[in-house]
């Protein structure tokens, strides 16, 4: 059961000074606190909608006094020198910008650039036409008084307009240049977890095994020391924002102890079943809640305490104090 030590940080998962608790409970079920060890790789993400805003030979990651994101990553690489540090990137980068990325890899032995287009995410894809078709069939099976004729007509019209070349959920998000683009591929990267480091031609990935976990951090997270060994309920935990007397699950820091974590697969199933699914609210939030049997009858604050990833050596979500770098 949950030990008193674990409650020090809002039931967070950063107990590294003593032997780990064995289990923690939520909604009447016990979950093993699984290990994310000191070799688990750290993944950052930078999807750049405007690469032209950088200098010709500059690494295309924001690095200003207000938003020192590249510095935060290189600082993490120095502190966590025994971990691989991945930077998952996407954008219309120039040859010179890709050269700058390569130089960054040479300058830091444990840093890897992982281009989105180099990663095979096809196992997580679904045809848009299949999503539309399933919802249309569900509407048609309803009695007339329960059927939404407006929605049915709209979906049938949009289904006819989907071309073969556009018939892919992943391709649809790859064309976006907004936060949904960022959030969707973050979810897929975390499904891959440590295996995403094996999706490059870089030989630095030799120490990462199939099925390994991953620690994801937004670039506004500042490391002040090593993370050590971390424990998480059934191997998954995430940042919880605590402001203005409210709490909310955040996707800015997420840890998983294995690839294809079933809580994230639950979220993917929501993305595969709704035409208007949202990568954050559905793909992460609803999926994690469903996996851990959260219902409106449960206390959301208690669920956030249960799932929270917090750590004394991470200054969390520093961009909340500034305007967005986007």
Curated annotation (Swiss-Prot):
Mn(2+) binds at residues 220, 317, 319. GO terms for cellular component: extracellular region; host cell. The active site is at 250 (proton acceptor). It is found in: Secreted; Host cell. Keywords: Glycosyltransferase, Manganese, Metal-binding, Secreted, Toxin, Transferase, Virulence. Belongs to the glycosyltransferase NleB family. This is Protein-arginine N-acetylglucosaminyltransferase NleB2.
């Amino acid at each position: 059961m949950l030990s008193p030590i674990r409650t020090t940080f809002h039931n967070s998962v950063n107990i590294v000074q003593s032997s780990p608790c064995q289990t923690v409970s939520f909604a009447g079920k016990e979950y093993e606190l699984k290990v994310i060890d000191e070799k688990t790789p750290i993944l950052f993400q930078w999807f750049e909608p405007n690469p032209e805003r950088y200098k010709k030979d500059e690494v295309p990651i924001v690095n200003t006094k207000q938003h020192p994101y590249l510095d935060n990553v290189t600082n993490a690489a120095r502190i966590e020198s025994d971990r691989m540090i991945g930077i998952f990137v996407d954008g219309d980068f120039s040859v010179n910008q890709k050269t700058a990325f390569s130089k960054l890899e040479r300058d830091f032995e444990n840093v890897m650039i992982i281009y989105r287009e180099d990663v095979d995410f096809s196992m997580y894809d679904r045809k848009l036409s299949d999503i539309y078709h399933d919802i249309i069939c569900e509407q048609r099976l309803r009695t007339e008084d329960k059927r939404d004729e407006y929605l049915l007509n709209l979906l049938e019209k949009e289904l006819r307009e989907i071309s073969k070349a556009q018939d892919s959920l992943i391709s649809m998000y790859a064309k976006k240049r907004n936060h949904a683009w960022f959030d969707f591929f973050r979810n897929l990267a975390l499904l891959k977890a440590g295996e995403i480091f094996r999706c490059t031609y870089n030989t630095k990935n030799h120490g990462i095994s199939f099925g390994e976990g991953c620690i994801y951090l937004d670039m506004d997270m500042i490391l002040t020391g090593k993370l050590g060994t971390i424990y998480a309920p059934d191997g998954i935990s995430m940042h919880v924002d605590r402001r203005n007397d409210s709490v909310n699950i955040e996707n800015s820091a997420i840890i998983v102890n294995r690839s294809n974590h079933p809580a994230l697969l639950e979220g993917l199933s929501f993305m595969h079943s709704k035409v208007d699914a949202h990568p954050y609210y559905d793909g992460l939030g609803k999926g994690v809640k469903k996996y851990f049997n959260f219902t409106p009858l449960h206390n959301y604050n208690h669920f956030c305490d249960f799932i929270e990833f917090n750590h004394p050596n991470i200054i969390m979500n520093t961009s909340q104090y500034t305007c967005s770098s986007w």
